[in-house]
């Protein structure tokens, strides 16, 4: 298993990323799992370098990439014609690595996984089922999108509060509100 994080690479003065040599690159295992925990473009470039080393040194390989958080996932739409579709740009770069499989955890929407070749989204309720989550007094859904997901969780019958975001015409959040029980003094879990 290869972990890509801020300790996996160095950055030269010109901004260039250089992946540190990893012992596993010399082993002839053929199957590699890469977990990318650095969601910056430096992290992505380190991932791309790891994939390049594996492909250069092995004629047969199986590369699985895991992104616990999909970079640019929240930029899954275009608000005006002059704005970039950042998620699409990132997913094109990721797909260009031609890895065997990509897993993302609880993608913000179906858009991101749909734009990545050979991608599977691990939904929130599956992650939740595998975690040792301490019981909470109140489960908070931060927005309407998350509220849809919370209904699939085993806590769906528990006390739930719904958060909403009020945006201006440019999409910036100008206010937030929480509907439901008060959160003060309670152990809350934002889902």
Per-region residue spans from a language model:
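PRPP-associated nucleotide enzymes
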Residues: 1-191
């Amino acid at each position: 298993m290869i972990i890509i994080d801020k300790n996996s690479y160095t950055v030269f003065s010109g901004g260039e990323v250089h992946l540190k040599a990893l012992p596993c690159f010399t082993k002839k295992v053929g199957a590699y799992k890469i977990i990318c925990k650095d969601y910056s473009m430096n992290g992505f470039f380190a991932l791309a370098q790891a994939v390049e080393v594996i492909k250069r040194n092995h004629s047969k390989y199986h590369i699985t990439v895991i992104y616990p958080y999909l970079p640019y996932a929240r930029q899954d739409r275009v608000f005006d014609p002059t704005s970039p579709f950042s998620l699409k740009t990132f997913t094109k770069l990721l797909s260009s690595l031609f890895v065997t499989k990509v897993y993302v955890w609880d993608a913000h929407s179906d858009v991101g996984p749909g734009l990545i070749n050979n991608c599977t989204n691990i939904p929130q309720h599956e992650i939740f089922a595998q975690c040792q989550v301490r019981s909470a007094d109140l489960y908070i859904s931060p927005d309407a999108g998350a509220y849809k997901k919370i209904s699939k969780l085993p806590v769906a019958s528990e006390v739930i509060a719904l958060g909403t975001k009020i945006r201006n015409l440019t999409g910036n959040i100008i206010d937030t509100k929480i509907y439901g029980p008060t959160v003060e003094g309670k152990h809350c879990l934002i889902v």
